[in-house]
Amino acid sequence: MLTKITLDNFKSFKNKTTVDLAKTNYTILPQNVADNGILKGCIFVGANASGKSTIILGVKLLLDFLFSERNLNSGIFLCMFGNGPCYSLSYEFLVEKKKINYFFEVDVVKKIISEKLWIDDALMLERMGLSAKSYIAEPAGVNYDEADVSKDTLFLRTLYFNTKFTSNPTLSAWMDYLKKSIYINMFDKNIISYGKAEVSVARYLDTSGCESINRFFDEYNFEQNIEYDHSSKGGNVRFVVEGDNTEKGIFFKRKGIEVPIPFVEESLGNQNLLRILPAFLNVINSGGMLLIDEFSSGFHNELESLMVRYFMEKADRAQMLFVSHSTNLLSNSILRPDQEYSVEFQNGNGSTVRR
């Protein structure tokens, strides 16, 4: 699980800034803390353009750079009013009772990438530019040069895809945790799965059926269920999906009325809810990080509160990091004070956070 992220000269964060997810001495809401003492998530609040989404981006970039094709040397990540041509991100994770620290720095002028990886403070990997040395499989170290090290790619990614870290169960478990992570931008309606988790509603229903989603609705008295079929009937209404019998559609049925309502005719809030539920339930059940930007877009305050409570209660080794403008989530009946981060932009000093 993620325990810390540190941003330095990154986007709006001119000065080195750390977000810590280790629990503090608060005793309320013990269900919001995993059994290893790490918080199951946190909220970032603040004014528009304060830097809230930048923190989410800092976590997302690790996933992008490891599992997607993305160029590290892009100058868009450098703080434009900062000092120097380098930006850096560092992360601390707790995996199988071992502390993993990973750091990378990018010089966007010289196009040089630096990386370091430690497990319990023992150096496992170091990289400078086009040369690297790994101690993961060989304690004496294995040297790599420009034939193995790409100027635009994390060497950690290269080693992972070449070896899957079969010689190191801790790193293998770390990668498995990261691949279970999912990013959601509620405003753009963009959902990215970094592993095998199915986040398309239709494909999720094809493989998992409606049971888990309807169970979520029933448990929290939503007074509605969904059906996923070629046709749906209720009252004097019957809908049939165009095409042969293999073509299916999503229908809502409100209890007490039972008339089917096609997905596209449902309220925007219900559409948004159903779109993110596969990702939401996947992370709860499988682990990983659920990163949500603009969580408050398209949701009623009570629904946001319900979903945060549900995640904290049901998740085990999973985390939900999210941006929201809903101040009702700052209640101590929903989140602990150590799960709440206020983000502020202080002119020439850039973005700052306060726990």
Question: Could you describe each region identified by the protein language model?
Answer:
Residues F103-H230:
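Electropositive, glycine-dotted interaction segments
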Residues Q224-G243:
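Long, charged, glycine-rich C-terminal linkers/tails
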Residues G37-I43, A47, I56-D107:
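Conserved P-loop NTP-binding catalytic core
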Residues I182-Y194, E242-V259:
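A short mid-domain helix/strand-loop element embedded in enzyme catalytic domains
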Residues T18-L21, I100-V106, A122-A137, P260-E265, ...:
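Short amphipathic beta-strand/extended segments with alternating polar/hydrophobic composition
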Residues M1-F65, F251-R355:
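Switch/communication elements of ASCE P-loop NTPase nucleotide-binding domains
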Residues I5, Y87-E92, I112-I119, E247-K255, ...:
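Short polybasic amphipathic segments
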Residues V95, D107-V109, F345-N349:
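Short acidic-glycine loop/turn motifs at beta-strand connectors
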